[in-house]
Amino acid sequence: MDEAQVLALLGAATPSGLDAILREVDAARLFRSVDDHVLGPRNRTALRDLLVSRLDDLGDEALANLAYGLQAGHTDSADERAIAAVFRARSGTGLTALKNQMNMRTDAHDLEGLVFVDVDDEQVREEILGHIAAQAEGLQIGEWKVLSDIDDTVVCALHDRRYPRGTIYPGVLALFDALDRGPTDTPFSLGDLTFVTARPRDALGLIENHTRASLRRAGIATSSVLTGGLINLVSHDLMAAKKVQNIEHYHALFPEYRLLFIGDSGQGDVVVGRGLIEHFAHVVDLVVIHDVVDTPEAERARLADEGIHVVDTYVGAALRCHERGLISER
């Protein structure tokens, strides 16, 4: 099928037919299959304009796939304006559902990557974030986004000598599942788990994709990942500062959700917890630190006074979460 036939097929599709096509097709390949010819028709532009003109015909899955198609590869200024139009196609809880759908990708092209990396026009980015903020105003989802470190929090990796390296900590996956389902086991959304790591982002997303693959092998099928940079590996304070910045981005993307942070005592996560309590006290309900360095009782008590709760096991973490009404009794 040549480029003109692709455009004709999509242009003639019924609303339900177009939605079905955009749900099933690899949108990045679709956009790569057409071109703006130097001495011929500008078919890629025509494809983008056609799909943007029919945003009202598309469901959340199709809209998220369209945004991915515009995001993957080179994203020019017209693509970025089209991405902004995708966000404007939804309001209220409909926008929340669309953002969650966008964030379900299993590669580096998630919501944070879309808004804060691929959209590099600050005016367009502010337009997107302004729409998100306006639609979240007064919106009460009543759920939490769980933000978690990885090394020595989910997987024994660096400082902990109690388990073989690579061990998934007992109870951590069950706790993530309970937090995802919430206190009533009837959540508005599932997949509300995001990993905040100091591991650097690279241009091709290879490190992030490797991290996601490792998490899937550990039994975590759906999650998003917020990465750091090489400079942030220099010190624990720089690691912590990057994590707090990533969480600031995340809160800007999901202002209608409350937040919970789970980290460990080995790599600056206590500093992250302090930063969250300082800057996001209005939405952060709990900071839990998994102890891997034998934190003394006096220090634990002092941290608890700051709102940072140190635990030895994920049974202890679950008790803290239940006390705060974050998980059900089941």
PLM features per residue range, with description:
Residues 1-148, 327-330:
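Non-catalytic pre-domain segments flanking phosphatase-related domains
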Residues 157-159, 204-210, 269-276, 297-300:
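A short acidic (Asp/Glu
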Residues 165-167, 192, 200, 228-232, ...:
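Divalent cation-coordinating acidic motifs and surrounding scaffolds
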Residues 174-186, 282-318:
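A short, conserved beta-to-alpha structural element at the edge of catalytic cores
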Residues 176, 180-184, 243-257:
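Short, basic/hydrophobic alpha-helical segments
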Residues 207-253:
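A charged nuclease-like catalytic/ligand-binding cleft shared by nucleic-acid processing domains
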Residues 255-266:
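Conserved Lys-Pro-Asp/Glu-containing loop-to-beta segment of HAD-superfamily phosphomonoesterases
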